[in-house]
Amino acid sequence: MAEKENTKRNRREEILQALAQMLESSDGSQRITTAKLAANVGVSEAALYRHFPSKTRMFDSLIEFIEDSLMSRINLILQDEKETFNRLRLILLLVLGFAERNPGLTRIMTGHALMFEQDRLQGRINQLFERIEVQLRQVLREKKLRDGQGFIHDEALLATQLLAFCEGMLSRFVRSEFRYRPTQEFDARWPLIVAQLQ
């Protein structure tokens, strides 16, 4: 029984990995059908539906992976790091680095892969970025509590600016067919970002 569960779990993971790889390839710029996905995995469409009731559920599973990966690591950063600018830097690098290591998933994060899918999926991605923005805003607000001095500008405005930087780098990565890495020249950009905050 346990072996059958492992086989089913492995097949589910194989399907999700194939979908992510297709999103990374040139197929990712077009609608990915279950027929194409089944052919890529080497199974029938019926076999796909034994593991996932719909393509939407496949995307849901990938979004869940993105959410879990980013939010759990953001929580670790907040737990381990106390200095405001280090926290912000690490959160930005986390989002950019995750996208760089997972180009297919970046198409989901930018909404590019969801254009032909249910609106609810885009809503989940919107919520993810709102959660990241809330975390950035919280880090910015805590500076006043930690250091006794806040920022000149409103923390909500600054958090939006930081998130816009991330989203812009992800968009550039997808638009360039993954040529321009999101973390490329980050160390050179970071002082410019800090200057905007102060």
Swiss-Prot record:
GO molecular function, one term: transcription cis-regulatory region binding
Record GO cellular component, one term: cytoplasm
Residue ranges of coiled coil: 119-144
Residue ranges of domain HTH tetR-type in the record: 9-70
Annotated SUPFAM superfamilies: Homeodomain-like, Tetracyclin repressor-like, C-terminal domain
Similarity section: Belongs to the nucleoid occlusion factor SlmA family.
Biological role: Required for nucleoid occlusion (NO) phenomenon, which prevents Z-ring formation and cell division over the nucleoid. Acts as a DNA-associated cell division inhibitor that binds simultaneously chromosomal DNA and FtsZ, and disrupts the assembly of FtsZ polymers. SlmA-DNA-binding sequences (SBS) are dispersed on non-Ter regions of the chromosome, preventing FtsZ polymerization at these regions.
Protein name: Nucleoid occlusion factor SlmA
Organism placement in taxonomy: Bacteria, Pseudomonadati, Pseudomonadota, Gammaproteobacteria, Enterobacterales
